[in-house]
Amino acid sequence: KHKEKNALRLHFTMDDNLALDASIKARYESMYSGVFYQRYIKGLWVLAEGVIYQAFTKESIVPTVPRDYSKYIVSMDYGIQNPTAMLLFGLCDGVWYQVDEFYHSGRETGQQKTDEEYYQDLCELVGDLPVRELIIDPSASSFIALVRKSNRFKVRKANNDVLDGIQHTSTIIQERKLLVNDCCTRTIQEYGLYSWQEKTSNGQDKPIKENDHAMDA
């Protein structure tokens, strides 16, 4: 194809860079998995297909036990018709643990919740833990206004770049800097189901918009 298009095709990998020693190459190789490993390490522009978080295995799931967390945050995917997911994370010895989760689907339960009810669910999830901030989609304007009015949580609006988020999450899973307590059953289920679309009209990488509410959080 490159001859037909009068294009020059170059392929190289880290092994072609003589300035990189073995330890640096090993570190970079350990950072990626799945499609990102094939692209960034092997230099192969392969299609994004299959399960997105291939590095998430049974070793990524840990017992729900007390730990000496130094910091807590909550990340939230807010939905009205779609499910709402809240994920509680704690930092311990340089590793982020998903400590607990909240998940509610109005469609599944037949019960839609108000902003006030979701705020109560957030407070129950957190309890008396010193949660520093809530990370949430900027489009959840009414809920953000309610949280700010309560003056308990600092709000940080999430970056909605999906591919950057997937790449970052893939890296920290691969490096075992993100682990999930076994009580977070919805999240664990989504890690096993969250997949790439087989083909998009413009050739862009996109996840299937299913089994993605904990993933979006």
Task: Report residues per predicted region.
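Signature of the SF2 helicase/ATPase Hel1-core->accessory helical subdomain module
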Residues: 1-15
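Conserved beta-strand scaffold positions in the cores of enzyme catalytic domains, especially
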Residues: 7-11, 73, 155
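Hydrophobic residues at beta-strand termini and immediately following loops
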Residues: 10-12, 41, 99, 158
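A residue-level signal for conserved active-site and pocket-lining positions in enzyme catalytic cores
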Residues: 12, 41, 86, 134, ...
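ATPase catalytic-site recognition across NTP-hydrolyzing enzymes
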Residues: 17-76
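Gly/Thr-rich phosphate-binding beta-strand-loop-beta motif of the actin/hexokinase/Hsp70
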Residues: 67-91
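Mg2+-dependent endonuclease catalytic cores in nucleic-acid-processing enzymes, primarily RNase H-like
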Residues: 92-209
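Charge-patterned, long linear interaction tracts outside catalytic cores
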Residues: 208-217
